[in-house]
Amino acid sequence: MKRFLATALLGLALCGVARAAIDTYEFASDAERERFRNLTQELRCPKCQNQDIADSNAPIAADLRKQIYGQLQQGKSDGEIVDYMVARYGDFVRYKPPVNERTWLLWFGPGALLLFGVLVIGVIVLRRRRTAAKVQTTLSAEEQARLANLLKNDK
């Protein structure tokens, strides 16, 4: 009975592997294959959070790979293919969105935050230095004499 259960579980486990889809495309040249690979790695899967369509197992990613392959076969340029995908799915489909009025915060926000942080730290350091300088006072003549006396007695 244990042997039967082990065999059944192994069979079920292998069913999932056998069902995994592997896309096979025929290319006329290695350059075309490289273009396909670059395009599928450059474009993000609309369904997946942070995965390109080359690595995604989502059904929409498989459809996008087929569309890219079809457009490559039609002789379209990389720019035309990317423009088609952006027109259909928006700038989200690109890993490197263009700099425009809608994406300026994405491009310049991190640098602005870093600059703001450096300014805040600089202001804090300057204020502490000024406060420390005000706290240091000179010793009166009586205090200096007492200090000198204490130092003499230590020797």
Swiss-Prot record:
The chain crosses the membrane at residues 105-125. GO terms for biological process: cytochrome complex assembly. InterPro entries: C-type_cytochrome_biogenesis, CcmH/CycL/Ccl2/NrfF_N, CcmH/CycL/NrfF/Ccl2_sf. This is Cytochrome c-type biogenesis protein CcmH. The keyword Cell inner membrane does not apply. It is a single-pass membrane protein. One of its GO terms (cellular component) is plasma membrane. Required for the biogenesis of c-type cytochromes. Possible subunit of a heme lyase. The keyword Metal-binding applies. Belongs to the CcmH/CycL/Ccl2/NrfF family. The gene is ccmH. Keywords: Cytochrome c-type biogenesis, Heme, Iron, Membrane, Metal-binding, Signal, Transmembrane, Transmembrane helix. Its main location: membrane. Residues 1-20 form the signal peptide. Heme binds at C45, C48. It is found in: Membrane. It holds the Pfam family CcmH. It comes from Pseudomonas aeruginosa (strain ATCC 15692 / DSM 22644 / CIP 104116 / JCM 14847 / LMG 12228 / 1C / PRS 101 / PAO1). GO terms for molecular function: metal ion binding.
